[in-house]
Structures are given as structure tokens and as C-alpha cells.
Amino acid sequence: MKRFAIEFAYDGTKFFGYQGQPNVRTVQGDLEDALERIFKERIYTQAAGRTDAGVHANGQVAAFNCPIERLTETDIKNALNANLPDDIYVKKAWVVDKSFNPRFAATKRIYHYFISTNEKDVFMRNYVWNFRYDLDIEAMRKAASFLEGEHDFSSFKKGKDEKNPVRTIYRIRILTLKKGLILIRVEGRSFLRSMVRNIVGSLVRVGLGQWKPEKILEVLEKRSRQEAAGTAPPHGLYLYKVLF
């Protein structure tokens, strides 16, 4: 039996997150429903990450076993796109080893977070955090540098579901793409639940001048969620790319 991986994008606005749940719409649920329509049996998938409600993806990766041996990568891509709703799109498909699990095989995950400090654009309200205050980008960059490397990120996680809060952030870049549009790019192998959004919330506190950049070190050392700033809203976040 062949095993395929797919890279796909989705607009997270109308989903209750990635992971399948009963009685609500999820990305995994829609993906597996599409596979069931194609193969006339339930096909279960494994994904590289589980995004929260409202979070988007440009490069999510999932894998599944294909019960029809003759199907090609192009067949899989085309069949899925013909059966998926218009807020999910499969960009490519490829054959993988039978043991491939994208969650554990990933060597890097890249997240993008977009902040707009411009006047509110109602057409972009589900895709950027509209934040009507100027931010000190240089101060945010300095604060972000303290988060790079291996740390206990207990202060930036949600809940108590992670037994090991130690993670490694390879790099954080903060870019001004055009006037009033800011991109925060976070690269790491894996992340705790809501970790990127919690980091963004604290970097914004620095950008406002409410915290000095060095405050981030103190927050890390306290290892308590209460020490960090509030969580940035989900609609500015994108799972941009997963590397293997």
C-alpha cells in the first residue's frame, strides 16, 4: 500500500482548529471527509501540526495510506482538490516511506505572524492583527534575540498538557514589509501550544514601550504563564512551512 504526503494551505477563519472534533468543522475533518468520498472508506491522516481555531496555514503537511496502488501524485492532488471546500487547497502530493509521520519527521517549522498598524481594513480583519499603535521594531528585535536558542518556554505555553516545556527557537525575524505591515517570522523544530502567539503578545508589549527588551529574560526565567503578556489573536498566525 502506498503512503502519500500532501502539502496544503487553508484559511482557518471558519474552522474550529485543525484537529478533528465531533459536531464542529475542522480542517482534519474536512480532509478525511474528502478522502472518504474518493476511496469510499475512512482514511485517517497524520499532520505536522495542529493549529488553533482561526489560525491559517500556507504549508501544512499531512500523510495517509492510499488503498489504490495505481494512483499517482498528480491523481491524489487533483482528486483531493475536486472534493475539498474552497478554503482548503492541496499544493502538492508525493510518495513517502510507510513509516513517515510528519509530526515526528519535521526538522523545522516556520510560523509567520502579521500585524498591521494601519487604519483597520475590514477585508483583512481575519488575516492580520490590526493594532492601531506604533511599535518600536528595534526594541522588539532585541527582545526576540533573547528567545533564540534552547529554553524552558513554560511562560509561553497554554495549559499543562506538555510534559517537557523545553524547546529550541532557531531564529526570530521581525520585518516591516510595507508601511504599517509587520511580519514576525519564528523558526523552530517544534512548539508548545499557543507558544508563538504568546511570544508575539510579549514582543508587542516591548514594542509599545511598556516593557524593556530585557524583560523577556525575566519572563523566561520565571517559567510561569502569568509572567508573560496576553496571547495574540489567532487570525494573524500562519503555519508557513514545514521542512523535513
From Swiss-Prot:
**Protein name (database record):** tRNA pseudouridine synthase A
Q: What species was this sequence derived from? A: Thermosipho africanus (strain TCF52B)
Q: Binding positions for substrate?
A: Y111
InterPro entries cross-referenced by the UniProt entry = PsdUridine_synth_cat_dom_sf, PsdUridine_synth_TruA, PsdUridine_synth_TruA_a/b_dom, PsdUridine_synth_TruA_C, TruA/RsuA/RluB/E/F_N
Record-level Gene Ontology MF annotations: RNA binding; tRNA pseudouridine(38-40) synthase activity
Q: What is the role of this chain?
A: Formation of pseudouridine at positions 38, 39 and 40 in the anticodon stem and loop of transfer RNAs.
Pfam assignment, any one: PseudoU_synth_1
The alphabetized list of GO BP terms reads:
tRNA pseudouridine synthesis
Q: Does the keyword tRNA processing apply?
A: yes
Q: What is its EC number?
A: 5.4.99.12
